[in-house]
């Protein structure tokens, strides 16, 4: 290969790589995950947990998504002691430091995250929140705001209208696109689990942009944050929307 051919080849490769980088940037990149649980399904296999033993058909989490967590990608336990990390991994959440929140945020979190009855907020902060640049107040404030936005969308309406019935991936993607813009459904992954002989939908994980990691996200548009995330495979293709109760 002559020097001229080599330069031409090198230039062509660089342009291809640059084009790929631009395309990736245009598609967005997931920096945070919003994990939203369908609590009745979670409780089918965790019936002894306080939040499950106390669940009723009238409670908020029976017909709305619950906040599992807000997770920075590929980071966990930032600046956490080995003892606290070990306690967290052993499920000894009651031994972890209390999460100091304002009365308003604490009340909002108790509604959005029924797992607070088992110390879930302590686990989420130790494992995930410590890897954000937010205060504990802002971290949970953002999480509550985002799951509230999900619960005022066509996605929640779809689930609430189909309790006890099977919902397919295509319908869920369409609901995301309806509420959060074209392509939003391509940034969602669905998880299912077995409850006896029935496959129930247990959780949705939603890809978000880096802007989800700022205190300003407490007033951000969930549609904008999803739009800035990267595409993913949907996972479970269908499942039953479980009703409260065992």
Q: What is the role of each PLM region?
A:
Residues 48-246:
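Domain-level detector of nuclease and nuclease-like folds
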Residues 10-12, 235:
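Compositionally biased, low-structure terminal segments
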Residues 24-51:
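N-terminal module-boundary/linker segments of secreted carbohydrate-active enzymes
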Residues 18-20:
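N-terminal signal peptide c-region/cleavage motif recognized by signal peptidases
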Residues 1-10:
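Bacterial N-terminal signal peptides that target proteins for export
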């Amino acid at each position: 290969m002559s020097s001229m051919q080599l330069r031409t080849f090198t230039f062509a490769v660089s342009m291809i790589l640059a084009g790929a980088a631009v395309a990736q940037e245009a598609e967005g990149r997931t920096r945070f995950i919003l994990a939203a649980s369908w609590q009745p399904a979670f409780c089918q296999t965790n019936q002894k947990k306080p939040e499950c033993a106390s669940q009723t058909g009238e409670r908020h989490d029976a017909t709305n998504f619950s906040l599992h967590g807000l997770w920075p990608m590929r980071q966990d336990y930032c600046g956490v002691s080995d003892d606290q990390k070990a306690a967290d991994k052993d499920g000894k959440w009651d031994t972890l430091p209390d999460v100091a929140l304002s009365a308003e945020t604490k009340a909002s979190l108790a509604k959005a995250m029924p797992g607070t009855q088992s110390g879930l907020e302590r686990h989420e902060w130790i494992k995930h929140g410590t890897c954000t640049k937010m205060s504990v107040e802002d971290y949970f404030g953002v999480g509550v705001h985002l799951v509230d936005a999900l619960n005022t969308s066509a996605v929640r309406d779809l689930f609430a209208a189909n309790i006890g019935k099977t919902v397919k991936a295509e319908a869920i993607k369409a609901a995301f696109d309806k509420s959060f813009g074209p392509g939003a459904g391509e940034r969602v992954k669905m998880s299912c689990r077995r409850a006896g002989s029935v496959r129930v939908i247990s959780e949705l994980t939603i890809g978000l942009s880096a802007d989800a990691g700022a205190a300003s996200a407490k007033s951000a548009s969930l549609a904008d944050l999803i739009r800035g995330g990267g595409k993913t495979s949907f996972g479970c293709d269908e499942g039953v929307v479980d009703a409260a109760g065992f």
